[in-house]
Amino acid sequence: QTCCGSKVFCC
């Protein structure tokens, strides 16, 4: 699981 963007959501 990798957090994307500003680490608010993970993809």
Swiss-Prot record:
One of its GO terms (cellular component) is extracellular region. It is found in: Secreted. Belongs to the conotoxin T superfamily. The keyword Lipoprotein does not apply. The modification Cysteine amide is found at C11. Keywords: Amidation, Disulfide bond, Secreted, Toxin. It comes from the Eukaryota. Expressed by the venom duct. Disulfide bonds: none annotated. GO terms for molecular function: toxin activity. This is Conotoxin tx5g. The keyword Methyltransferase does not apply. Contains 2 disulfide bonds that can be either 'C1-C3, C2-C4' or 'C1-C4, C2-C3', since these disulfide connectivities have been observed for conotoxins with cysteine framework V (for examples, see AC P0DQQ7 and AC P81755). The cysteine framework is V (CC-CC). It comes from Conus textile (Cloth-of-gold cone).
